[in-house]
Amino acid sequence: MTQYLQDTVEAIAIDLVNPGICHFVWKACDDVVFEHIRSSDFIAFINLHKKAPIPIIKDRRAGKMCHVLYELSLCHSIPGLTNQWIEHMLVALGIDNETYQHHHLIKPNSLGTSKSNKKFAERIQEAIKLADIINL
């Protein structure tokens, strides 16, 4: 993590991504995209809290995790830190930038998108919308 990103997160003492959004995304991904972790641990990881455990991505699920990171990056409370946040997440999760560039954008209405990926992308978008509706 860059020093600037860490200093900014600590100085403002707010979450980069709304914990409610993180929780609903966690519900859609837990034990599907990554091995089971507690919701609070996922929220802490996404918001760069110190000593947060790193989710263990399941085999052949890195592409879906890239999409999750992309969708969460659209919800950042400080958009100017988005690229640094994504870079940090990729390094922490052991995902290379090429994989992210290839998989981050899953378009549910695209002809080339698999049925599984369409369903997954819709679940993530629904989770984010639900958190917004509930206004957590």
Language-model segments: residues:
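Flexible coil/loop and intrinsically disordered linker positions at secondary-structure junctions
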Residues: 1-136
